[in-house]
């Protein structure tokens, strides 16, 4: 059986880890073992935060929509209830975009929601 020399593969593996750890502080960018540990943590944080980002944006959109609806004399939950009753299917991302960039169109949606609220809800 032929002898297998693993120096090339090991060096390549270490080099890729150290290259991806570039920019880290201190030993974490220079020593292989420290860099590898930091890369594992970094990947964990990236994975977690890619999922958390979705909730963060939803909270931001809801905050913006709530502020705009209150300027138009209505609360967020009544606004959403009225839109649902009217059959308007616009997601929160678009509603927040309208609230920031096109206040007249948003005010029209608030009026639609207000007209379609059930009796006693307003």
From Swiss-Prot:
Keyword terms, alphabetized: Ribonucleoprotein, Ribosomal protein, RNA-binding, rRNA-binding
Spans through the membrane: none
Superkingdom of source: Bacteria
BP terms from Gene Ontology: ribosomal large subunit assembly; translation
GO MF assignments: rRNA binding; structural constituent of ribosome
Gene3D superfamilies found in the cross-reference section: 6.10.160.10, Ribosomal protein L20
A cellular component term, taken from the record's GO annotations: ribosome
Family assignment from sequence similarity: Belongs to the bacterial ribosomal protein bL20 family.
PANTHER family: 39S RIBOSOMAL PROTEIN L20
Record's function text: Binds directly to 23S ribosomal RNA and is necessary for the in vitro assembly process of the 50S ribosomal subunit. It is not involved in the protein synthesizing functions of that subunit.
Protein name per Swiss-Prot or TrEMBL: Large ribosomal subunit protein bL20
Organism: Saccharopolyspora erythraea (strain ATCC 11635 / DSM 40517 / JCM 4748 / NBRC 13426 / NCIMB 8594 / NRRL 2338)
């Amino acid at each position: 059986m032929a002898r297998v020399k693993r120096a090339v593969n090991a060096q390549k593996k270490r080099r890729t880890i150290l290259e991806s750890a570039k920019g880290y502080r201190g030993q974490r960018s220079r020593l292989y073992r420290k860099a590898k540990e930091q890369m594992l943590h970094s990947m964990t944080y990236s994975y977690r935060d890619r999922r958390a980002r979705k909730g963060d944006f939803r909270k931001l959109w809801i905050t913006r929509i709530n502020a705009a609806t209150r300027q138009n004399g209505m609360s967020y939950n009544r606004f959403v209830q009225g839109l649902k009753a009217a059959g308007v299917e616009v997601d929160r991302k678009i509603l927040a975009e309208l609230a920031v960039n096109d206040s007249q169109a948003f005010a029209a949606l608030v009026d639609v929601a207000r007209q379609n609220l059930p009796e006693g809800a307003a």
